């Protein structure tokens, strides 16, 4: 049976917040296909709890947000990427509001801002303690209504294709419903496949987060950066059942981490105590667990009050009760789990990789924002900012790209084309190479 071939302007592989932001930001004149591997669109974005970090108060400033990001990332971040993405944060929040995302507000109608570890100010906009779910619930119907967008589920991306100019021009897929191999040809291919956390035994990620996007790009020689930096979230519920992440904001609002004797131990490790960045808190918890020969520590939020817990943390309260724990009355057993890949496919600030025709956005990409350790709530922000930036770049380059593969090319193609050795890819940006060379040796211990 001959292989099926279809053609689209933009092929987006991954249906999380990054892919959705791109799809909804493309002009109506461009035909796009949104590919996901599950039976329904599912991603780590729906599991994100905290929110988006953005400077929205008079007490805050972009410079403070930049400094917090650089400190959390052990100064391994790319300074230009940090400044550009964080400066775009208020516009990203406004875009979500225009998309009818129900962000929490104060009684006087202002956006409610919470604080999380590593942040010096309150700057996290959120939807209770299930921000990612609320965002995607608002965006998915809009994706379905976009007439220029074709959504395909149950499809696995197998290999990227390139034309005679070396430009990525399509992808080979396997449709799990029809059991057929197909080729989707595209003028622009965008990887938005998420991270690799489910490679670890204990992870907050969905089962699909196995690093397939990085593998696809690596196989054709795309530059990869900082894969060694995998963030562990400090506070995952330690009970029987699937890993459940307890939002950073529980500590941001004043929650305490306790040892076996009910004593706060974080002040022994860092002056910021529970508000230290995630890598510091995770290492401190691991050290405390080893010292006490225990599999977890305690998280105490009882003093926040039942009203605060019910209003701002309903999901955590509900899940605790479902597992026989009451956050209003009990210490909660918590332990770290693999959470976020800070590295990935190296890109510029429009999502372009080192391989023409291929872009990457979201957790699969490495813009240089996160450095050796991501600052809380900078990831959903990056998804929106980079999704919109990639859409703008694709629209701007529409008339200039090389010709894509055509269905007729299929009959003469025998194997994927590789661009040199994938072990020595060309860098996407020279300044990042300098960053890598200067910082690799100094930062290997920043995210154990």
Label each PLM-derived region with a short phrase.
Residues 1-8, 25, 31, 39-40, ...:
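Glycine- and aromatic-enriched mobile tails/lids
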Residues 10-34:
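N-terminal Rossmann-like FAD-binding beta1-loop-alpha1 element of flavoenzymes
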Residues 38-70, 74, 231, 241-247:
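Conserved N-terminal glycine-rich FAD pyrophosphate-binding loop of Rossmann-like flavoproteins
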Residues 40, 216, 222-327, 393:
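An anion/pyrophosphate-binding glycine-rich loop and adjacent beta-alpha core
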Residues 79-90, 123-141, 152, 203-211, ...:
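Short beta-strand to alpha-helix junction loop
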Residues 99-181, 185, 192, 233-238, ...:
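Conserved redox-cofactor binding core of oxidoreductases
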Residues 153, 158-169, 174, 312-365:
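A glycine-rich dinucleotide-binding beta-alpha-beta segment and adjacent secondary-structure elements
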Residues 188-244, 378-386:
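Glycine-rich loop(s) and the adjacent beta-strand/alpha-helix scaffold that form part
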